Amino acid sequence: MSKARASTVVHVPRRFVAEEWGGTETVILEISRQQQRAGGTPVIMTSMALARQRNEIIGGVLVKRYPYCYPFFGLSADDRAALDKKGGNLLSLSLFYALYCEPKVRLFHAHALKRLGGEVRTAARLRKKPFVVSLHGGVFDVPAAELGTMLKPIENKMEWGKPFGALFGSRKVLEDADFVICVGQSELEKAKRILTHDRIAYLPNGVDCAKFTTGDGAAFRAQHGIPPDAFLVLNISRIDAQKNQALLLEAFARFRLQEPKAFLVLIGPETQPSYAAKLRELVVTRQLDRQVKILPGMRNDQPELVQAFHAANVFVLPSMHEPFGIVVLEAWSAGRAVIASRVGGLQALVRDGETGLFMDPNAPTAVADLAAQLARLAGDPGFCKALGEAGRREARAHYDWEQIGRQLEDLYRLAEEHRKQHA
């Protein structure tokens, strides 16, 4: 990564806690580390959502947190918890004030929209600093069903926070941004059609190839009672309807009729407790309780995370919607074959039959199709290994974080140039 000026890049996600880790957290942490190596002083400024302490060092990067609320009348504790987990449109005046006062700011990097994005926009404008926005979870490419799930906690609730949205220009964030970064190609194409400016670029997520190259898969199997000769199917993602683990469970049940020794491991934080309950019920009704392990989400620095990839024979990501799919890069770096949904950013990431296999999660035959692909890989170990090795080469050649960091620095400079021209 090119030498950056010794000033602060302020990253602003909606929440950031080690115990509820996902792709967005990985991206923010890794690009912050790249910025540190280049001489910069990144800081993560966020809300107290799901957190127990105000300030914390995570992975060598300072995280500052601030009180917040959801400005709706009538929210229950369960509603607030659901909004914390996913999609909550929060308000934090103390965070806004901190953004306004943070010293030596070079640039603001928003990793959220809505009111929080508006706070970043307004702080940047008041301070005459550039700001960029990354679209991690998708904005223009989100299925209606998923959007409805995210909005359910505020259904029929009176919102008293609209004046703050107007004050902070929440609906102008993307139009006013000095640069908009899309992690998925499909999101990029839609953003170019909808936004009135051309300050938009595709920048994929990256992976720490070295971290995932080696791992003790045998130790993971032994810890969780999985025989050494079992064909192990792995999914690591949020336990959420978007991630579609129910389809994987149904396909696995069918696959086990051909491969009785097969095991399935699901790992991830439960962002939809009701969906997690549905999965556990499905495990029981399909009589899979001895062959399926549902494990809680793991911290990014847990050795067991890497061990899980190396324990697996195949990694499956059956998402209904996926802007990018950073876990595919992690599976590739571990040399594991991948089966992924032909949706969103995955369509540009995976080459069918070369670096992975595609499945259509919306097809009437999706369960049978996925079961057949699992059977194909289990029955042809050579092909399974070749897919994994091709993925490893792809990750090393195009997605190492150092490369992504250099490209991000180029976008920062374009954002700075735009801000100078429009000061």
Language model features with spans:
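Short alpha-helical donor nucleotide-sugar binding micro-motif in glycosyltransferases
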Residues: 297, 307-312
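Nucleotide-activated donor-binding/catalytic signature segment of Leloir-type glycosyltransferases, i.e.
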Residues: 276-299
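Short hydrophobic beta-strand element within catalytic cores of glycosyltransferases
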Residues: 337-340, 350
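Carbohydrate-associated surface elements
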Residues: 186, 206
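Membrane-proximal helix-turn-helix segments that form the acceptor-binding/catalytic region
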Residues: 118, 126, 139, 157-179
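Aromatic "clamp/platform" in nucleotide-sugar-dependent glycosyltransferases that forms part
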Residues: 320
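Conserved donor-binding/catalytic core segment of Leloir-type glycosyltransferases
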Residues: 10, 227-243, 249-252, 265-267
